[in-house]
Design a protein with these regions (language model features):
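Catalytic nucleophile-His microenvironment captured as a short glycine-rich beta-strand/loop
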Residues: 19, 91-126
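Loop/turn elements at helix/coil->beta-strand transitions in domains of secreted/extracellular proteins
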Residues: 68-72, 88-92, 115-118, 145-148
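Alpha-helical scaffold elements lining the catalytic groove of polysaccharide deacetylases
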Residues: 77, 85-88
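Noncatalytic regulatory segments and standalone regulatory/sensor domains
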Residues: 113-156
Length: 156
């Protein structure tokens, strides 16, 4: 997200407001085998899926998936469905409210689950001090505790 920090998005920039498209770019790159940047993830739609003062509309994820050929997207609030999907190799985006991952609202990628049931996270706003890329998270106490919703992406 910060690599594309000064690129305009919404009322600000990708750095300040682009966690949704940046999360989608990670998943689309994985599913298509082609590098899709956060710039690519917003260039096709501009700000049409952005609500000022709120952020990226949830409907963006299915629309972007359709646009980039990433397959079906299932929206859920069920953490067990998410764990099952992760164990089957399906990447997931989670909308987070204030808590471990953010002080406001934020989208993160759940990229997998360990043999011990811990969730692996790609955070578009990760840093060397947080180092979330190298951590394992408990689904119920750390991820689901502040989750608003999840989007499970079909693996093509």
């Amino acid at each position: 997200q910060t690599d594309y920090g000064n690129i305009p998005y919404g009322g600000g920039s990708i750095a300040s407001s682009g966690c949704g498209p940046t999360s989608f770019a990670m998943i689309a790159s994985y599913l298509t085998g082609t590098t899709i940047t956060p710039i690519d993830a917003i260039s096709w739609c501009g700000n049409s899926y952005y609500k000022p003062g709120v952020g990226t509309y949830w409907s963006y994820f299915q629309a972007a998936s359709d646009h980039f050929g990433c397959g079906a997207v299932t929206q859920t609030r069920d953490p067990n469905q998410v764990l099952q999907a992760l164990s089957e190799g399906h990447p997931v985006i989670s909308s987070q409210r204030a808590g471990l991952f953010t002080s406001g609202g934020h989208f993160i990628v759940l990229r997998g689950v360990t043999a011990g049931g811990k969730v692996l996270v790609n955070d578009p706003n990760d840093s060397s001090s947080k180092n979330y890329i190298n951590r394992e998270f408990d689904m119920m106490t750390e991820v689901h505790a502040t989750a608003n919703a999840y989007w499970i992406f079909a693996k093509k």
